[in-house]
Amino acid sequence: MPNFIDRRLNPKDKSLGNRQRFLKRAREELKRAIKEQVKSGKITDVDAEHNVSMPARGVSEPTFQPAGDSGERQYVLPGNREFAAGDRLPKRSSGGGATGAGAGTGQSQDEFQFVLSREEVLDLFFEDLELPDMVKLNLKESVAFKRRRAGFAATGSPMNINVGRTMRNSFGRRIALHRPGRKEMEAIAEEIARLEVEPNAGAKHLQHLEELRQKLEKLERRRRRIPYVDPVDIRFNRFEQQPLPNASAVMFCLMDVSASMGEREKDLAKRFFVLLHLFLKRRYDRIDIVFIRHTDEAGEVDENTFFYSKQSGGTIVSTALEEMLRVIRERYPAREWNIYAAQASDGENISGDSERCASLLHDDLMRLCQYYAYVEIIDERETEIFGTTDNGTSLWRAYRTVDGEWPNFQMTRIAKPADIYPVFRKLFGKQPAVQVRK
């Protein structure tokens, strides 16, 4: 039987194997906790660590233990004044195999705090959306970088060795340690050779010759002790990762908040906005998010008001498009910003206003936007009623004319989280760049 040894380093001195087993065991509870946090938190908070609370009863690992109401067992217990050897003790009547003094039958309400990493949060968030595996990997990757020279380092790969800086350090060290030079030693060797061939050498002459030989031997020993290139001299080219310079993008979130948009519809819309934000974050360093909500009138609001305000009323969709156009002209010129828009609605609109919406898109907004996505949130039972894309509300039919003319416009109906991802296939797939007409 083969044995597999996991030698991966544990992150931050924690047990990786135990962590993975816990995530697998408590996956449904963690998914529920993440869903609640996404529902109540900000769009930008999804792409970060999360501190998740879950009931403590779901933390312990399942174990085998003897049943408390059956079987025969022998114990060695400390002495006492109530029982003697041979006494029969009644079995405890606690249910469910609970052991220990005072074990109750109620469920513990204590909560367990668990910190999920960014990658684990995204895994749980993407699970309901049914994203392809490659798309999940791309969204979880950090921003793209390029290598840039950043000085020198004492360690590195042999292929990055800097010969010039290494020889410069070697030269300075040899000067500081007075390493004998080759010319000096060659001059002494030549002098020794000349004295050795001279005839009639006297005692003084022989003494001088011996001194030269000793000096040459001393210089050779010193030269061997001081190497030409020492490991301390070696320098390597150092590189650091520099983020690729990207342009800025602004993401407009438009949503109908009339009485017909319930909590289910708003939850699906928020998932759609979160996914679009994650896609854009992969492409741009800076992303501004503008929230515009509308009933019979529209206005720019903060995120909390956008999702949780109780305001309701009639429905005039064109007011949201007019507000978006006003904000673009005031703060986000198209020559400096990449403009993306996502509109969520149930399709209800006042009579005659849908044509006004199509006109605003045709004449103004589609010329400014890199991409405009419209999602119509319907009930799952309505998916059979709207069998073809031509059927639908007046707003859907009006937007179909825009979809036919502008390649950077995408529209779809969603009834469940798994329907959200197809909206992004055309936008982020490999395709020719969209030519926005002027």
UniProtKB/Swiss-Prot annotation:
Pfam families: DUF444. Residues 94-105 have a biased composition (Gly residues). Residues 1-16 have a biased composition (Basic and acidic residues). Residues 1-20, 83-107 are annotated as: Disordered. It comes from the Bacteria. PANTHER family: UPF0229 PROTEIN YEAH. Belongs to the UPF0229 family. HAMAP family: UPF0229. This is UPF0229 protein NGR_c12350. It comes from Sinorhizobium fredii (strain NBRC 101917 / NGR234). The lineage of its organism: Bacteria, Pseudomonadati, Pseudomonadota, Alphaproteobacteria, Hyphomicrobiales.
